[in-house]
């Protein structure tokens, strides 16, 4: 059963199909937009975990390790945030050696906030 508009060219069925199509497209694009951030976050987390593995740092809980790695950048920009203070904090939190904590901190900074490496460690990067 179709109902025609005044000019007889458009039916109620066509209107409903157009509305359904628009709703479907809105859902697809909305879903894609909401997935973009988690996918990006997963890519960075995976890159971080891979870099830790390559550096010889073992971890048991990937999600906790990624969260700890992400916590480094706010420490860098906090007042008094020095490489030594951050490394000490990482060693304290994880119970890892100072050298291991230093490597963890460098990998975290290199992954999540690479722009602060040179200002944070000016004397360590000289050839």
From Swiss-Prot:
<feature type="transmembrane region" description="Helical">
    <location>
        <begin position="100"/>
        <end position="120"/>
    </location>
</feature>
<keyword id="KW-0812">Transmembrane</keyword>
<keyword id="KW-0564">Palmitate</keyword>
<keyword id="KW-1133">Transmembrane helix</keyword>
<protein>
    <recommendedName>
        <fullName>Putative lipoprotein LprJ</fullName>
    </recommendedName>
</protein>
<comment type="subunit">
    <text>May interact with sensor protein KdpD.</text>
</comment>
<keyword id="KW-0732">Signal</keyword>
<dbReference type="GO" id="GO:0005886">
    <property type="term" value="C:plasma membrane"/>
</dbReference>
<feature type="topological domain" description="Extracellular">
    <location>
        <begin position="35"/>
        <end position="99"/>
    </location>
</feature>
<feature type="lipid moiety-binding region" description="S-diacylglycerol cysteine">
    <location>
        <position position="35"/>
    </location>
</feature>
<dbReference type="Pfam" id="PF05305">
    <property type="entry name" value="DUF732"/>
</dbReference>
<keyword id="KW-0449">Lipoprotein</keyword>
<feature type="lipid moiety-binding region" description="N-palmitoyl cysteine">
    <location>
        <position position="35"/>
    </location>
</feature>
<feature type="signal peptide">
    <location>
        <begin position="1"/>
        <end position="34"/>
    </location>
</feature>
<comment type="function">
    <text>Overexpression induces expression of sensor protein kdpD gene at low K(+) concentrations (0 and 250 uM, tested in M.smegatis).</text>
</comment>
<keyword id="KW-1003">Cell membrane</keyword>
<dbReference type="InterPro" id="IPR007969">
    <property type="entry name" value="DUF732"/>
</dbReference>
<feature type="topological domain" description="Cytoplasmic">
    <location>
        <begin position="121"/>
        <end position="127"/>
    </location>
</feature>
<keyword id="KW-0472">Membrane</keyword>
């Amino acid at each position: 059963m179709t109902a025609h508009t005044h000019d007889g060219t458009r039916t109620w069925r066509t209107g409903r199909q157009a509305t359904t199509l628009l709703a479907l497209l809105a859902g697809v694009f909305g879903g894609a937009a909401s997935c973009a951030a988690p996918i990006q976050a997963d890519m960075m987390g995976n890159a971080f975990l891979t870099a830790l593995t390559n550096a010889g740092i073992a971890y048991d809980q990937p999600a906790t390790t990624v969260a700890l790695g992400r916590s480094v950048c706010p420490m860098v920009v906090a007042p008094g945030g020095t490489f030594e203070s951050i490394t000490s904090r990482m060693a304290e939190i994880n119970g890892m050696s100072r050298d291991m904590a230093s490597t963890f901190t460098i990998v975290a900074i290199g992954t999540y906030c690479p722009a602060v490496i040179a200002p944070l460690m000016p004397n360590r990067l000289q050839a």
